[in-house]
């Protein structure tokens, strides 16, 4: 059988795209300040709650900028209690490889795949978010090769449930230079997540993009609990008090820096019932109030939110409505943010 792979075109190097779409000096300083604030939260120097919130998929630059502009206003209202990082996710993992895979693949969700244009579109959008709202953002590190196109713009990274066992993802996380959350796998096996955190915190040597690479380890690699699927295909949560205590105990069995948990309030924790995110977020806050140990280790929440409630199919054309997983609409999101600030 012949190799079933066609090399379509050579893509530009990350440094070339960074030079074409640069981040200007004042915003590089802003990113450094935001990076330090998040590091202080993860290391316990700052007792604010990290809130990573935004669309399931950042599919449309005008709507994403609109959302982040609204978010910036409420972020200023709660800045003493919450540190907000927009999730601007431009890659979408697909279980069977079909469907919309994010702006990286399709700058126009209704158009053809064009990764040459996609690379530039996602960088341009992240730069515009920083310049227009003052936010540096979170992204999923779905493709290790893609990270360096955005690495000078991002303040938080996540390794997804399907990628967390992959050696290259763990090694990239070990050199990312920002906090990287390692999600529990879809099976719910917490040992996989903990192994991934340990690998990311260690020094690593590996081959990448034609280079021999050495990393010094990422002391801010940490756990993200996102629920799981049992043997019957049913969504099972892992955000409850006993789940948080279990991860605290697992950290205690290892020599890891900066024990931390971020709870993903959607995905299998909510069974993808987006309205459940409100209840789940409050439940986690109650666990933090009940136990000082839980309060110390639960550093943040992750919420899927956009301008309009729910989701739509590609082509329906509702502005600010998710074309992937259902999200909380803006009014509910704003009310939740204000309530969470009162609960910190």
Question: What name fits each language-model region?
Answer:
Residues 1-42:
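N- or domain-start disorder-to-order transition segments that initiate the globular core
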Residues 2, 68, 81-246, 267-272, ...:
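Active-site-facing alpha/beta catalytic cores
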Residues 39-47, 253-258:
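Glycine-rich phosphate/diphosphate-binding loops that line cofactor/substrate pockets in enzymes
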Residues 50-63, 325:
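Conserved phosphate/anionic-ligand binding catalytic regions in large, soluble enzymes, centered on
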Residues 54, 263, 329:
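Conserved, mostly hydrophobic/aromatic
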Residues 56-59, 258, 266-272:
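Short acidic, Gly/Ser-rich segments with clustered Asp/Glu that frequently serve as metal-coordination loops
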Residues 306-344:
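Internal helix-turn-beta structural module
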């Amino acid at each position: 059988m012949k190799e079933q792979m066609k090399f379509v075109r050579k893509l530009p190097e990350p440094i070339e795209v960074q030079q074409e779409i640069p981040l200007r000096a004042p915003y590089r300083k802003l990113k450094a300040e935001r990076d330090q604030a998040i590091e202080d939260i993860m290391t316990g120097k700052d007792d604010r709650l990290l809130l990573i919130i935004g669309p399931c998929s950042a599919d449309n630059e005008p709507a994403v900028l609109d959302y982040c502009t609204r978010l910036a206003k409420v972020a200023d209202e709660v800045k003493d209690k919450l540190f907000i990082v927009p999730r601007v996710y431009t890659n979408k993992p697909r279980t069977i490889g079909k469907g919309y895979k994010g702006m990286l693949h399709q700058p126009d969700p209704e158009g053809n795949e064009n990764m040459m244009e996609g690379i530039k579109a996602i960088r341009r959008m992240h730069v515009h978010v920083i310049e227009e709202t003052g936010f540096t953002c979170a992204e999923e590190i779905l493709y290790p090769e893609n990270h360096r196109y955005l690495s000078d713009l991002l303040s938080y990274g996540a390794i997804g449930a399907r990628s967390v066992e992959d050696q290259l993802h763990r090694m990239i996380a070990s050199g990312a230079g920002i906090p990287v959350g390692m999600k529990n796998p879809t099976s719910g096996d917490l040992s996989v997540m903990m192994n991934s955190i340990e690998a990311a915190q260690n020094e690593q040597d590996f081959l990448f993009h034609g280079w021999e690479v050495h990393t010094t380890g990422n002391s801010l690699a940490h756990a993200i609990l996102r629920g799981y699927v049992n043997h019957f295909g049913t969504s099972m949560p892992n955000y409850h008090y006993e789940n948080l205590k279990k991860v605290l105990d697992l950290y205690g069995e290892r020599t890891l820096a900066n024990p931390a948990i971020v709870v993903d309030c959607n995905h299998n924790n909510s069974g993808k019932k987006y309205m459940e995110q409100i209840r789940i977020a409050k439940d986690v806050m109650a666990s933090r109030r009940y136990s000082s140990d839980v309060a110390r280790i639960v550093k943040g929440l992750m919420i899927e939110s956009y301008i309009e409630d729910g989701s739509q199919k590609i082509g329906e054309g509702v502005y600010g409505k998710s074309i992937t997983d259902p999200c909380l609409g803006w009014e509910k999101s704003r009310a939740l943010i204000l309530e969470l600030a009162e609960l910190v």
